[in-house]
Design a protein with these regions (language model features):
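Histidine/acidic-rich helix-loop-helix segments that form or flank divalent-metal centers
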Residues: 79, 88, 128-191
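Short, low-complexity, polybasic intrinsically disordered segments
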Residues: 103-107, 156
Length: 193
Protein backbone atom coordinates (compact mmCIF):
# COMPACT_ATOMS: atom_id res chain seq x y z
CA UNK A 1 0.00 0.00 0.00
CA UNK A 2 1.22 3.47 -0.85
CA UNK A 3 0.11 5.56 2.12
CA UNK A 4 0.53 8.89 0.35
CA UNK A 5 -1.59 7.77 -2.61
CA UNK A 6 -4.45 7.16 -0.16
CA UNK A 7 -4.50 10.92 0.54
CA UNK A 8 -3.79 12.22 -2.96
CA UNK A 9 -7.01 14.27 -3.12
CA UNK A 10 -6.75 15.59 0.44
CA UNK A 11 -3.10 16.63 -0.03
CA UNK A 12 -4.30 18.70 -2.99
CA UNK A 13 -6.34 20.85 -0.61
CA UNK A 14 -3.10 22.02 1.07
CA UNK A 15 -1.61 24.91 -0.89
CA UNK A 16 1.73 25.51 0.82
CA UNK A 17 4.38 23.16 -0.56
CA UNK A 18 6.30 22.95 2.73
CA UNK A 19 3.20 22.01 4.71
CA UNK A 20 2.18 19.57 1.99
CA UNK A 21 5.65 17.94 2.12
CA UNK A 22 5.56 17.72 5.92
CA UNK A 23 2.11 16.18 5.69
CA UNK A 24 3.53 13.53 3.34
CA UNK A 25 6.34 12.87 5.82
CA UNK A 26 3.87 12.31 8.66
CA UNK A 27 1.53 10.18 6.52
CA UNK A 28 4.44 7.84 5.79
CA UNK A 29 5.00 7.54 9.56
CA UNK A 30 1.39 6.54 10.30
CA UNK A 31 1.07 2.94 11.46
CA UNK A 32 -0.32 0.51 8.89
CA UNK A 33 -3.37 -0.18 11.06
CA UNK A 34 -4.58 3.40 10.51
CA UNK A 35 -5.53 2.48 6.94
CA UNK A 36 -7.33 -0.73 7.90
CA UNK A 37 -9.28 -0.37 11.14
CA UNK A 38 -12.80 1.03 11.66
CA UNK A 39 -13.17 4.49 13.19
CA UNK A 40 -15.26 2.89 15.94
CA UNK A 41 -15.27 -0.72 17.05
CA UNK A 42 -18.81 -0.43 18.40
CA UNK A 43 -20.37 1.93 15.87
CA UNK A 44 -21.61 4.01 18.78
CA UNK A 45 -19.92 7.27 17.82
CA UNK A 46 -19.54 7.15 14.03
CA UNK A 47 -21.70 6.83 10.88
CA UNK A 48 -21.90 3.65 8.81
CA UNK A 49 -19.28 4.71 6.25
CA UNK A 50 -16.64 4.81 8.97
CA UNK A 51 -17.25 1.28 10.18
CA UNK A 52 -15.55 -1.85 8.88
CA UNK A 53 -12.19 -2.15 7.17
CA UNK A 54 -10.81 1.27 6.24
CA UNK A 55 -13.37 3.09 8.37
CA UNK A 56 -10.83 5.26 10.19
CA UNK A 57 -9.34 6.28 6.85
CA UNK A 58 -12.80 7.22 5.52
CA UNK A 59 -13.66 9.14 8.72
CA UNK A 60 -10.42 11.08 8.35
CA UNK A 61 -11.10 11.88 4.69
CA UNK A 62 -14.61 13.06 5.61
CA UNK A 63 -13.24 15.34 8.36
CA UNK A 64 -10.69 16.84 5.95
CA UNK A 65 -13.32 17.36 3.25
CA UNK A 66 -15.70 19.02 5.72
CA UNK A 67 -12.88 21.34 6.78
CA UNK A 68 -11.97 22.11 3.19
CA UNK A 69 -15.58 22.86 2.20
CA UNK A 70 -16.17 25.10 5.22
CA UNK A 71 -12.98 27.04 4.51
CA UNK A 72 -14.22 27.75 0.95
CA UNK A 73 -17.06 29.81 2.47
CA UNK A 74 -15.68 33.36 2.85
CA UNK A 75 -17.71 33.91 6.04
CA UNK A 76 -15.57 31.16 7.62
CA UNK A 77 -12.42 30.96 5.52
CA UNK A 78 -11.65 34.68 5.56
CA UNK A 79 -10.97 34.41 9.32
CA UNK A 80 -7.80 32.42 8.60
CA UNK A 81 -4.63 32.93 6.60
CA UNK A 82 -3.78 30.46 3.85
CA UNK A 83 -1.08 28.91 6.07
CA UNK A 84 -3.49 28.56 9.00
CA UNK A 85 -5.99 26.81 6.73
CA UNK A 86 -3.30 24.39 5.55
CA UNK A 87 -2.20 23.63 9.11
CA UNK A 88 -5.79 22.96 10.20
CA UNK A 89 -6.32 20.63 7.22
CA UNK A 90 -3.08 18.84 8.08
CA UNK A 91 -4.30 18.55 11.67
CA UNK A 92 -7.54 16.98 10.46
CA UNK A 93 -5.61 14.57 8.28
CA UNK A 94 -3.45 13.44 11.22
CA UNK A 95 -5.80 13.88 14.19
CA UNK A 96 -6.58 10.16 14.70
CA UNK A 97 -3.25 8.89 13.39
CA UNK A 98 -2.44 6.97 16.57
CA UNK A 99 -6.00 6.16 17.62
CA UNK A 100 -5.02 2.67 18.78
CA UNK A 101 -1.63 3.77 20.11
CA UNK A 102 1.83 2.77 19.04
CA UNK A 103 2.44 -0.07 19.17
CA UNK A 104 -1.16 -0.96 18.32
CA UNK A 105 -3.48 -1.79 21.19
CA UNK A 106 -6.85 -3.52 20.99
CA UNK A 107 -8.99 -0.50 21.83
CA UNK A 108 -8.98 3.25 21.22
CA UNK A 109 -6.50 5.09 23.38
CA UNK A 110 -8.36 7.94 25.07
CA UNK A 111 -5.15 9.95 25.03
CA UNK A 112 -4.62 9.42 21.28
CA UNK A 113 -4.70 13.19 20.60
CA UNK A 114 -1.72 13.65 22.94
CA UNK A 115 0.04 10.60 21.49
CA UNK A 116 -0.25 12.01 17.96
CA UNK A 117 0.90 15.50 18.96
CA UNK A 118 3.89 14.00 20.78
CA UNK A 119 4.65 11.78 17.77
CA UNK A 120 4.83 14.87 15.58
CA UNK A 121 7.17 16.54 18.08
CA UNK A 122 9.36 13.41 18.12
CA UNK A 123 9.73 13.80 14.35
CA UNK A 124 10.12 17.59 14.41
CA UNK A 125 13.66 17.32 12.99
CA UNK A 126 12.21 15.64 9.88
CA UNK A 127 9.79 18.52 9.25
CA UNK A 128 10.34 21.79 7.39
CA UNK A 129 7.60 23.83 9.08
CA UNK A 130 8.53 26.53 11.59
CA UNK A 131 8.34 25.84 15.32
CA UNK A 132 5.30 28.13 15.53
CA UNK A 133 3.51 26.21 12.75
CA UNK A 134 4.30 22.84 14.36
CA UNK A 135 3.03 24.14 17.71
CA UNK A 136 -0.26 25.21 16.07
CA UNK A 137 -0.55 21.81 14.37
CA UNK A 138 -0.02 19.95 17.64
CA UNK A 139 -2.45 22.21 19.51
CA UNK A 140 -5.32 21.51 17.10
CA UNK A 141 -4.66 17.77 17.26
CA UNK A 142 -4.40 17.69 21.07
CA UNK A 143 -7.78 19.41 21.47
CA UNK A 144 -9.78 17.73 18.68
CA UNK A 145 -11.98 15.83 21.15
CA UNK A 146 -13.66 19.09 22.13
CA UNK A 147 -15.47 19.01 25.49
CA UNK A 148 -14.85 15.26 25.94
CA UNK A 149 -11.71 15.63 28.02
CA UNK A 150 -12.26 13.02 30.75
CA UNK A 151 -11.28 9.38 30.39
CA UNK A 152 -13.50 6.43 31.29
CA UNK A 153 -12.52 6.80 34.96
CA UNK A 154 -13.44 10.48 35.12
CA UNK A 155 -9.84 11.72 35.02
CA UNK A 156 -9.20 14.97 33.19
CA UNK A 157 -6.77 13.86 30.46
CA UNK A 158 -7.25 16.12 27.46
CA UNK A 159 -7.31 19.87 26.92
CA UNK A 160 -10.53 21.44 25.67
CA UNK A 161 -10.29 23.67 22.59
CA UNK A 162 -9.89 27.38 23.31
CA UNK A 163 -8.70 29.03 20.10
CA UNK A 164 -10.58 29.48 16.84
CA UNK A 165 -8.19 26.99 15.22
CA UNK A 166 -8.79 24.33 17.86
CA UNK A 167 -12.55 24.85 17.73
CA UNK A 168 -12.58 24.60 13.94
CA UNK A 169 -10.72 21.27 13.89
CA UNK A 170 -12.94 19.90 16.65
CA UNK A 171 -16.07 20.99 14.78
CA UNK A 172 -14.96 19.24 11.57
CA UNK A 173 -14.12 16.01 13.43
CA UNK A 174 -17.42 16.23 15.29
CA UNK A 175 -19.41 16.68 12.07
CA UNK A 176 -17.56 13.76 10.46
CA UNK A 177 -18.71 11.56 13.33
CA UNK A 178 -22.43 12.45 13.12
CA UNK A 179 -24.50 9.47 12.04
CA UNK A 180 -26.96 11.53 9.99
CA UNK A 181 -24.23 13.00 7.76
CA UNK A 182 -23.47 10.22 5.30
CA UNK A 183 -20.52 10.82 3.00
CA UNK A 184 -20.50 8.63 -0.13
CA UNK A 185 -17.29 6.70 -0.85
CA UNK A 186 -16.30 4.61 -3.85
CA UNK A 187 -14.60 1.21 -3.67
CA UNK A 188 -11.19 2.90 -3.41
CA UNK A 189 -12.08 4.86 -0.26
CA UNK A 190 -12.41 8.12 -2.20
CA UNK A 191 -15.28 10.51 -1.59
CA UNK A 192 -17.48 10.10 -4.63
CA UNK A 193 -19.03 13.59 -4.87
Amino acid sequence: MNKIDEFEVELGYIKDETIQEDCRTMIELLPDYFFLVPASSTGKYHPSYSLGEGGLLRHTKAAVRIGYELLQDPSIGDKYTSIEKDIMLMGLLLHDGLKLGIPREQYTRFDHPILMANYIMEHKADLLMSDEEIDLLCSVIKTHMGPWTKDYNGNEVLEAPKTKYQNFVHMCDYLASRKFLLVPFDDNNRISV
